[in-house]
From Swiss-Prot:
Residue positions where N-acetylalanine is found in the record: A2
Residue spans of the WD repeats: 3-40, 50-90, 94-131, 137-174, 180-218, 230-273, 319-373
Name of the featured protein: tRNA (guanine-N(7)-)-methyltransferase non-catalytic subunit WDR4
GO terms of molecular function: enzyme activator activity; tRNA methyltransferase activator activity
The organism of origin for this protein: Homo sapiens (Human)
Primary gene name: WDR4
Protein's job: Non-catalytic component of the METTL1-WDR4 methyltransferase complex required for the formation of N(7)-methylguanine in a subset of RNA species, such as tRNAs, mRNAs and microRNAs (miRNAs). In the METTL1-WDR4 methyltransferase complex, WDR4 acts as a scaffold for tRNA-binding. Required for the formation of N(7)-methylguanine at position 46 (m7G46) in a large subset of tRNAs that contain the 5'-RAGGU-3' motif within the variable loop. M7G46 interacts with C13-G22 in the D-loop to stabilize tRNA tertiary structure and protect tRNAs from decay.
UniProt induction comment: Amplified and overexpressed in a number of cancers (at protein level).
Effect annotated for changing K83A: Slightly reduced formation of N(7)-methylguanine in tRNAs
Chain positions covered by the region annotation Disordered: 377-412
Subcellular location: Nucleus; Chromosome
Length: 412
């Protein structure tokens, strides 16, 4: 999938990416005008160290494919379409290394100890890269027979969780990735996103092209709850496509809330995790007039929404009673929105990038209708042929010749 616009929050640091660039700024105070901008297209390009089937040197544009913070926010990593993994230190911002990867990547995550970053690619492999040795080569950890779409780790770093195009979620032991603890099976389309619940480290959230949000006990592979998004009738726009694949699952520890953003819909779904009953409770739909690019929770402030609107690129939502409501623009929000407006070209240029999941759905072929039609035509032809054989030949006057009982036709 091509690069697209994205939002990431960790602590008081906000990152917005678009195309080959990202910008990082602080949301701690309106007086903090620190701003870090990085352009991957200007980063160093090396010959590929981990050569695979692809060309030795990929001439990509530098478009960012995936990015993430480490747990503490001390590190930030991204991958681009030039097959590079770029690692940053955030306090202060500094590029630590630029390393090559074997394939274009689809997702990445830091392990909880922040010693390694795991990178999943389109060929189904997961590589680990050292953070402590920022120039070290990658190590192959595990592989699928299908494209990987997301990767996560358990809070204790014991398990690596991977989601692929062929409907599977695999739970592997980190110390011995060839040893599989379980599979979480039940999705009927590609698994687009997975997220371990921070407040319940044994639970996993997943979403798929089948239009469901599911809750799992991942070590046993047991499904605890399944929510069909299409069943929430008030959410369905008759003019909108009826396919729901999550492009983002965000979790807010403070309220045990889940925000779900689906690909191609200007809607954010809000659920609440009932840990005692081990189920998801639908709370609210947040509808927008513009395309929503990404969402992220900030623990002390609420839900940040990045949208395709130059006048108001960022919107902040907080729960007020039982309903989520937009917050009047604060000085911090005004400051960050002003920064985005000043760099709007990088976002606007990436808005049309094909980062959707539409190409991942199973191809369906309706060959039954054509088969039945051809079968009916064939039977009709056979019936007409039999009728012609049974009809007696015509006489001299054009009428069928009548034969007497017992009279047989003579043939030469």
């Amino acid at each position: 999938m091509a690069g697209s616009v994205g939002l990431a929050l960790c602590g008081q640091t906000l990152v917005v990416r678009g195309g080959s660039r990202f910008l990082a700024t602080s949301i701690a105070s309106s007086d903090d005008d620190s701003l870090f901008i990085y352009d991957c297209s200007a980063a160093e390009k090396k010959s590929q160290e981990n050569k695979g089937e692809d060309a030795p040197l990929d001439q990509g544009s530098g478009a960012i494919l995936a990015s993430t913070f480490s747990k503490s926010g001390s590190y930030f990593a991204l991958t681009d379409d030039s097959k590079r993994l770029i690692l940053f230190r955030t306090k202060p911002w500094q590029c630590l290394s630029v390393r090559t990867v074997a394939r274009r990547c689809t997702a990445l995550t830091f392990i909880a100890s922040e010693e390694k970053v795991l990178v999943a690619d389109k060929s189904g492999d997961v590589y680990s890269f050292s953070v402590l040795e920022p120039h070290g080569c990658g190590r192959l950890e595990l592989g699928h027979l299908s494209m990987l779409l997301d990767v996560a780790v358990s809070p204790d770093d014991r398990f690596i969780l991977t989601a692929d195009r062929d409907e599977k979620i695999r739970v592997s032991w980190a110390a011995a990735p060839h040893s599989i603890e379980s599979f979480c099976l039940g999705h009927t389309e590609f698994v687009s996103r997975i997220s371990v619940v921070p407040t319940q480290p044994g639970l996993l959230l997943s979403s798929s092209g089948d239009g469901t949000l599911r809750l799992w006990e991942y070590r046993s592979g047991r499904q605890l709850h399944c929510c069909h998004l299409a069943s929430l009738q008030e959410l369905v726009d008759p003019q909108a496509p009826q396919k729901f694949a999550a492009s983002r699952i965000a979790f807010w520890c403070q309220e045990n809330c889940v925000a779900l953003l689906c690909d191609g819909t200007p809607v954010v779904y809000i659920f609440q995790l009932d840990a005692r009953r081990q189920q998801l409770v639908y709370r609210q739909q947040l509808a927008f007039q513009h395309q929503v690019w990404d969402v992220a929770f900030e623990e002390t402030q609420g839900l940040w929404v990045l949208q395709d609107c130059q006048e108001a690129p960022l919107v902040l939502y907080r729960p007020v009673g039982d309903q989520w409501q937009s917050v009047p623009e604060s000085t911090v929000l005004k400051k960050v929105s002003g920064v985005l407006r000043g760099n709007w070209a990088m976002l606007e240029g990436s808005a049309g990038a094909d980062a959707s999941f539409s190409s991942l759905y199973k191809a369906t072929f309706d060959n039954v209708t054509s088969y039945l039609k051809k079968k009916e035509e064939r039977l009709q032809q056979q019936l007409e042929k039999k009728q012609r054989r049974r009809s007696p030949p015509p006489g001299p006057d054009g009428h069928a010749k009548k034969m007497r009982p017992g009279e047989a036709t003579l043939s030469c």
